Amino acid sequence: MERVGCTLTTTYAHPRPTPTNFLPAISTMASSYRDRFPHSNLTHSLSLPWRPSTYYKVASNSPSVAPYCTRSQRVSENTMLPFVSNRTTFFTRYTPDDWYRSNLTNYQESNTSRHNSEKLRVDTSRLIQDKYQQTRKTQADTTQNLGERVNDIGFWKSEIIHELDEMIGETNALTDVKKRLERALMETEAPLQVARECLFHREKRMGIDLVHDEVEAQLLTEVDTILCCQERMKLHLDKAIAQLAANRASQHELEKDLSDKQTAYRIDDKCHHLRNTSDGVGYFRGVERVDATVSVPESWAKFTDDNILRSQSERAASAKLRDDIENLLVVTANEMWNQFNKVNLSFTNRIAETADAKNKIQTHLAKTLQEIFQTEMTIESIKKAIKDKTAFLKVAQTRLDERTRRPNIELCRDMAQLRLVNEVHEVDDTIQTLQQRLRDAEDTLQSLVHIKATLEYDLAVKANSLYIDQEKCMSMRKSYPNTLRLVGFC
């Protein structure tokens, strides 16, 4: 800035700019004392009595800065600056020592800041390296633990797979023996089993066909003679069913455990091979605070071991039951001869009676279906007629509605109005008549449909009875079973 006045106090027209750096640029410092104070032009001949004029410059006029004077003291450009009586106003604010001390302070602060920054950088670099090595070691330890966990899971998984294969094999073997026992009871075990299956299937007859006929009497006689074999087979069959349920429950636990092990193996193996550069890594805030674990390594291993022990126990019981069933089939295969021909003759007579009744029902059903078709056609024609009349009714009512909007005296009850009203009543009566006829036709159709349903049900009953007697029962009794079939092989 331009200094004006005496050496006692220096007055500036504007405040000193705040430096943005520790040391301002030389150009800034040099220019800060030039042409900063616009004032009225002072002639070069102006002399200041208390200071030689060679040490001061005459202030130049700057259009960007207002003169340093009050409103009442403003003068024109050609007016000279009067002498100021207050000498203290023009003295400088700082001494050279202050200036040097300020610079020295800035230098020291700069050195201190740079020293602290350098120390921080060195410490930070060392900290980064230490933490990097520590993090890598921690990750390596975690990776090793994951690898050990994967090996543990793999061991128990192989144990489960081995036991599961054994259990599946035993379950399949018991299932085969059970099927042989069922075949002996239902299809191939001598007269007792044939009679038992025939009675069982004939209980599936429906409606009026559930009669106590000659066939049932002969079958009951056949069953009574060999009831003891039947009870023994059913007892062992129930045991086999219960054992299969136990085997499947144990197998289910093994399969569930194996599925969990496979999932855990896949997850832990993925985690074991996961690296910093792997795809799919990301931030999951707060996941380390979520403890969703439900077991410890000891309880985890004991859980799988208990499942394997339970499976082994069930396999031993299943093998013993298979041996008992095998012995039972061999014993009961030699105890079966009774009333075979009488039962077959009774079946033949009953099948003929049922077939004749079925043919008559089919004839009535065909006629009923034809009548239903005709009635449905009538209903459709009535509906079409009603729909056609509805269009006429809409037009007439629309005309009446539009004519209600005639203004004032134009609302005349003329011939057109009367004809429209009559037309609405006439069409409405026609629709009502057709709707009544439609209801009558629908009632008739419902009656026909009910009769059809009754005939169809009766036909299904007869067809079911024929299927049971002819296909189910007689197919089992076409020939006497041989020894292999009596023990369940066929």
Curated annotation (Swiss-Prot):
GO biological process, one term: regulation of brood size
Glycosylated residues, chain numbering: 7, 9-10, 41, 86, 103, 111, 276, 344
Keywords attached to this entry: Cell projection, Cilium, Coiled coil, Cytoplasm, Cytoplasmic vesicle, Cytoskeleton, Flagellum, Glycoprotein, Membrane, Ubl conjugation
Top-level division of the source organism's lineage: Eukaryota
Coiled-coil segments on the chain, per record: 424-451
Main subcellular location: cytoplasm
GO CC terms of this entry: acrosomal membrane; acrosomal vesicle; axonemal A tubule inner sheath; axonemal microtubule; extracellular exosome; microtubule cytoskeleton; nucleus; outer acrosomal membrane
Tissue: Expressed in spermatozoa. Expressed in airway epithelial cells.
Cellular localisation: Cytoplasm, Cytoskeleton, Cilium axoneme; Cytoplasm, Cytoskeleton, Flagellum axoneme; Cytoplasmic vesicle, Secretory vesicle, Acrosome outer membrane
Signal peptide feature range: none
Annotated membrane topology: Peripheral membrane protein
Processing after translation: N- and O-glycosylated.
Free-text function comment from the UniProt entry: Microtubule inner protein (MIP) part of the dynein-decorated doublet microtubules (DMTs) in cilia and flagellar axoneme. Forms filamentous polymers in the walls of ciliary and flagellar microtubules. Required for normal sperm mobility.
Quaternary organization: Microtubule inner protein component of sperm flagellar doublet microtubules. Interacts with TEKT1, TEKT2, TEKT4 and TEKT5. Interacts with CCDC38.
Similarity comment: Belongs to the tektin family.
Disease field: Spermatogenic failure 81: A male infertility disorder due to oligoasthenoteratozoospermia and characterized by reduced progressive sperm motility. Patient spermatozoa exhibit acrosomal hypoplasia and detachment of the acrosome from the sperm head.
Name by which UniProt lists this protein: Tektin-3
Native organism: Homo sapiens
